[in-house]
Amino acid sequence: MNVVPIEKKDLRWEIGVNVAYNKNKITRLTASDDPSYPGVETGGISGGVGNNIQIQKVGNPINSFYVFQQVYGEDGKPLEGVYVDRNHDGQITDDDRYVYYKPDADVNIGFNTEISYKKWTLSASLRSSLGNYVYNNIASNTEMKADMWTNNFICNRVATAPYSNFAQAQYKSDYYVQNASYLKLDKVTLAYNIAPWVRVNFTAQNIFTITNYKGVDPEVGNGIDNNMYPRSRNFILGASFNF
């Protein structure tokens, strides 16, 4: 949807908004309906051997996270190795894992605006993703207190290690499935028409991100954050000539 709130001789303001609602659900994984089919584990992660953190399961979204339900202490911190016995059999096994959120957003929103005043033009574009979750594999593979001090050396670890207080890895805990909704200011451009045939502009890209996600960047394609190279912030000075 595009609207022009102001349009005068020397001043024009245009606004554009688009909204997409996303929903997906797996309806069948076998040749014929089989309610007993457990699904297909996927989403390999770093740490351990053969660990998968996602599942394709009928009735659930694609690549849903498949994890243990973490139990927390009175101080709000997760208790190491303590999970909810969801099937009430008196022991914690893989049968106690459950489907917990998904990497795809519920809603994607795009917003752009452009203001022109005489020879000046200012434009900006923002994006928002709501309802998407990310498994923070960086944290799950580096937060262990037992690995912070080895061979008389202090090892590099993520700053969130003291919050979990885990001595050993808890790869399949839902503690590491984190809300990755975000708002990003993608681009701002300021342009000036020196003459009808000369235009100069300054552009800034990837300006800021607002999110509660604890990793580097919440925009992770497959929902598993594992050493993704962060996007750069760019500043561009340009000029265009029409002959």
Regions found by a protein language model. Give the residues of each.
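Extracytoplasmic gating/loop element in the C-terminal half of outer-membrane beta-barrel translocons
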Residues: 77, 127-205
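Outer-membrane beta-barrel and related beta-rich outer-membrane complex signature
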Residues: 24-43, 131-156, 210-219
